[in-house]
């Protein structure tokens, strides 16, 4: 949500991020742009320019960032981009490809992977913006990149919040869960989460624009007067609705689940189902915890910068970039967490990366089944393969 490209000349820019000296220039989307959230209450960089910090009319730190710093940031962004795109697209492929992966929880995970993939796809643009000190991609891409950052932040936290409520229902109200926790309902809720995210994403898209200043182009958010009021209103809304409220809901849900799990030995009447329920609950909890750890620093940083003046130092510059990078890093961590914490994802990832003869045979059997529906005369052939297929399915069935 950082709204601007870093200007090439910072000599007369002394208050771009709500304090008396320019903050380090993240990239157009850095903080996931929350950098916008550390807004600029009085901006000497230009009389009509307003920024929320970070990308929003970014000013680079006094003096250009060192080559080592720039290379380090670009290397980190490159790793996050490659791992994030590959990992999240793999997660989406696995959920679409394998029928047994189409559970309510995995439908939510698909939505999370989609939001993360979109966010990591903006990193190449932000890297170029950071290195060149200008935004060379035009107004349309400026609007798209900034809005994607906001959409990612809100959709991700809304989805995690939904997953926590879903886990609460599964653990504490198992009977009601039978009717409520269906893939169809999960898809409807995912659509609702994107619609809710549009309450911020669409206005931001309309506010984003490019501005020419001192030989460079800024990708920035523009606000109506009084700019300080609308800047701070946006920062407060993001902090409350994308952090405080979801974290409170998640905390309450898991608090109630912990009490339930401690007080009841058997939740479903089956040890196997119980083990599966606890495993999925643990995975969702870890994903939520990692998200909070990755996003808390930038939220806190933005609020502090909005309230007090922070003198620019090397430590401040490094910590700022670290907070921004940490937010983006979360987008590539989730697929890794699924691979380590969920046996079903682990097995599907392994089958995708290292196809085995049994996997190929199972796929061929599936094709034969489909052909038989179209050509009933081949029923005898299918009968001979059914026994093999059943054995293969038993061997490769997702672990509970």
From Swiss-Prot:
Belongs to the G-protein coupled receptor 1 family. It is found in: Cell membrane; Cell projection, Axon; Perikaryon; Cell projection, Dendrite. A lipid is attached at residue 353 (S-palmitoyl cysteine). Expressed in brain. Isoform 16 and isoform 17 are detected in brain. Residues 94-106, 166-185, 256-279, 339-400 are cytoplasmic. This is Mu-type opioid receptor. Gene3D superfamilies: Rhodopsin 7-helix transmembrane proteins. Keywords: Cell membrane, Cell projection, Cytoplasm, Disulfide bond, Endosome, G-protein coupled receptor, Glycoprotein, Lipoprotein, Membrane, Palmitate, Phosphoprotein, Receptor, Transducer, Transmembrane, Transmembrane helix, Ubl conjugation. The gene is OPRM1. OPRM1 is the main physiological target for most clinically important opioid analgesics. OPRM1-mediated inhibition of voltage-gated calcium channels on central presynaptic terminals of primary afferent nociceptors is thought to be one of the primary mechanisms mediating analgesia at the spinal level. Opioid-induced hyperalgesic responses are observed following both acute and chronic dosing associated with cellular excitation. Phosphorylated. Differentially phosphorylated in basal and agonist-induced conditions. Agonist-mediated phosphorylation modulates receptor internalization. Phosphorylated by GRK2 in a agonist-dependent manner. Phosphorylation at Tyr-168 requires receptor activation, is dependent on non-receptor protein tyrosine kinase Src and results in a decrease in agonist efficacy by reducing G-protein coupling efficiency. Phosphorylated on tyrosine residues; the phosphorylation is involved in agonist-induced G-protein-independent receptor down-regulation. Ubiquitinated. A basal ubiquitination seems not to be related to degradation. Ubiquitination is increased upon formation of OPRM1:OPRD1 oligomers leading to proteasomal degradation; the ubiquitination is diminished by RTP4. The modification Phosphothreonine is found at residues 372, 396. Residues 1-68, 132-142, 208-230, 307-314 are extracellular. The keyword Phosphoprotein applies. The chain crosses the membrane at residues 69-93, 107-131, 143-165, 186-207, 231-255, 280-306, 315-338.
């Amino acid at each position: 949500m950082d709204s601007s490209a870093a200007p090439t000349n910072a000599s007369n820019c002394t208050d771009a991020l709500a304090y008396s000296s320019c903050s380090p220039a993240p990239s157009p989307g850095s903080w996931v742009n929350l950098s916008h959230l550390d807004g600029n209450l009085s901006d000497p960089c230009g009389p009509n320019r307003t920024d929320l910090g970070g990308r929003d009319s970014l000013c680079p730190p006094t003096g250009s960032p060192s080559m080592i710093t720039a290379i380090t940031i670009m290397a980190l962004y490159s790793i996050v981009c490659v791992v994030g795109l590959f990992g999240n697209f793999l997660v989406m492929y696995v959920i679409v490809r394998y029928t047994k992966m189409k559970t309510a929880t995995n439908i939510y995970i698909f939505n999370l992977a989609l939001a993360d993939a979109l966010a990591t796809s903006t990193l190449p643009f932000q890297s170029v913006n950071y290195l060149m000190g200008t935004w060379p991609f035009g107004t349309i891409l400026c609007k798209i990149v900034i809005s994607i950052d906001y959409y990612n932040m809100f959709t991700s936290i809304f989805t995690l919040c939904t997953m926590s409520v879903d886990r609460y229902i599964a653990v504490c109200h198992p009977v009601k869960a039978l009717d409520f926790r269906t893939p169809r309902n999960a898809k409807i809720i995912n659509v609702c989460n994107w619609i809710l995210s549009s309450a911020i994403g669409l206005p931001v898209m309309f506010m984003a624009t490019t501005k020419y200043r001192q030989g460079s182009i800024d990708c920035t958010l523009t606000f109506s007067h009084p700019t300080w009021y609308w800047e701070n209103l946006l920062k407060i809304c993001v902090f409350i609705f994308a952090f405080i409220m979801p974290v409170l809901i998640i905390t309450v849900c898991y608090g109630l689940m912990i009490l339930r799990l401690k007080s009841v030995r058997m939740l479903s009447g089956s040890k196997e189902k119980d083990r599966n329920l606890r495993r999925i609950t643990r995975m969702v909890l870890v994903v939520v915890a990692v998200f909070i750890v990755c996003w808390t620093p930038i939220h806190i940083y933005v609020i502090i910068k909005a309230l007090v003046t922070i003198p620019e130092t090397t430590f401040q510059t490094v910590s700022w970039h670290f907070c921004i990078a940490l937010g983006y890093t979360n987008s590539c961590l989730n697929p890794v967490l699924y691979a380590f914490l969920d046996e079903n994802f682990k097995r599907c990832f392994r089958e995708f990366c290292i196809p085995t003869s049994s996997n190929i045979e199972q796929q061929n059997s599936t094709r034969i089944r489909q052909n038989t529906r179209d050509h009933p005369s081949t029923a005898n052939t299918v009968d001979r393969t059914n026994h093999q297929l059943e054995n293969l399915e038993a061997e490769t069935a997702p672990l509970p």
